[in-house]
Each structure stands twice: as structure tokens, then as C-alpha cells.
Amino acid sequence: FATATLDYGTQVLWPDHCVQGTDGAALHRDLTLAHAQLVIRKGYHRHCDSYSAFVEADRNTPTGLAGYLRERGIERLFAVGLATDFCVAWSALDARQAGFAVAVIEDACRAIDTGGSLAKAWSDMNAAGIQRGISAEF
């Protein structure tokens, strides 16, 4: 993948994906959203990408998710999704740094695994004290 240097550092230029307003960005039709109180949208700032659900890629702009969870007394998070080595890992690491207990459910994730990125992500998450398991364990 190509990269670009932005104000906040090097950014990977991913192929277009999860474009707002397309099926690729839509929540699954079988997902029950009647009780959803918050949807965090990320990666929509033109000049700043976003891997984490907690902090934009500039590492300075919070999404508000940590405060939202704290206000509701939530202390433990389960991370799932795409891609394990980027969005899931960054979100899990930022959640851990914000003081949450975090578990990544491995069989509910999928990685890109480019240039050893998956091994590095698991190593970083392990070093941060993030639990790793499969869905049957939770």
C-alpha cells in the first residue's frame, strides 16, 4: 500500500472501503438497533484518517467514546471487527490506555496482515494487558 505524509505523520492510503452511504459502510441488516444509544462514525474527516474508535489518527482528537462509556459505568470492553491489526488493535489499545479492561475476541475479527502487522498488533496488545480469546470463552 502507498503512504502519504500528513500533518500528524505517515498515513497508509487504503483502497476505498466503508464509504459512508454505501452498503460497505452499513450496519448488517440483521443487527437489532432498537436499543442503540450511540453510533460512532470514524474515518470521515477529509484530512485525518481514523483507525481507533477512541482517538483519531492524529492522536489528539478524541471521538468521545471513552467519556460516553465512563458516564454509563462501563469498565470492560470486548473488541471485534475488521481489521484485527489496525482498527481493532488501535481501538483496543486506546481503550486500555483510557483505563478500560479489554478483551479481543479473535474469532470475531479478521486481519489484513501486511508486513507482519498482525504479529505486531498481538504483541502490542499483549504488552498492554489486553486479553485475547475466542467467543466460546466469553
What are the functions of these language-model segments?
Residues T3, Y8, H17, F100-A108, ...:
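Feature captures the catalytic ectodomains and active-site-proximal regions of enzymes
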Residues F1-R76:
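Active-site alpha/beta core segments
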Residues A26-L38, D113-F138:
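Structural recognition of alpha->loop->beta junctions
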Residues I74-W90, V104-R110:
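Glycine-rich anion-binding loop/nest that anchors nucleotide
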Residues R96:
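Gly/Ala-rich phosphate-binding loop of Rossmann-like dinucleotide-binding domains
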Residues K42, I105-D107, S135:
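Generic beta-sheet signal
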